[in-house]
Amino acid sequence: ELQNIETQKPLFYPTGFHTFGAALQDYAALTPVEALNVASVVLPAVSLALSAAFLAWVMVGRRGLTGALAAGLAPVAVVGVIPVFYVEYYTGAWPNASALSMVGIAAAALMKVPERPKMIPAAALGFAGVGAVHPSAIPVVAVIVALWWLLWKLFVPTGREQGKRGFFRGVWLRCKDVLLIGVTAIAGGA
């Protein structure tokens, strides 16, 4: 059990990365070194590509060919982020690297909640999962979602297409979007 050296009080340390490595070791019959290699290299690589794909898909906002092309080409653009990965990897910050590579997945899930409220449980679990791997990624998700709301959803709220107009209707739609995202984030963080 981790504890503070000076006060002897217990410390919180997220165990998501280590639990993933232990599960790999048990279920895939890997040695500890092999499990660490998979957890520290493959997990961030795959989740970074998925994060880029999900964020591109959300930014394009379409399900057709344009969305598919954006989601397919976004991981190629992530290759430029490779130096950041090596800094994290060679300093031994493997949980941090894994959590930061999952940020786009959690942010994209939270961004879809105002359009599809039935995604609240999945988005909350995704947000909680990123925090379980390493809590340093939670503010990054919050900043991405807040900027998305301020720069896009504030001007184009979710229920705008329904035809009803008016100041109070617009305020209600924006408040509803913030409430749905906030409830999801709180449920994931609790």
How does the language model describe each region?
Residues 69-73, 120-125, 138, 142, ...:
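Hydrophobic alpha-helical transmembrane segments
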Residues 78, 183-190:
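Transmembrane signal-anchor helices characteristic of membrane glycosylation enzymes that use polyprenol
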Residues 140-185:
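Perimembrane helix-loop-helix junctions
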Residues 27-28, 80-81, 129-137, 187:
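Transmembrane helix irregularities
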Residues 97-115:
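Specific aromatic-rich, kink-prone transmembrane helix
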Residues 1-102:
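Active-site lumenal/periplasmic loops and adjacent helix-entry segments of GT-C-fold
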Residues 109, 119-135:
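Membrane-interface alpha helices of multi-pass inner-membrane proteins
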Residues 91-95, 131-147:
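Helix-loop-helix junctions and helix-breaking kinks within/between transmembrane helices
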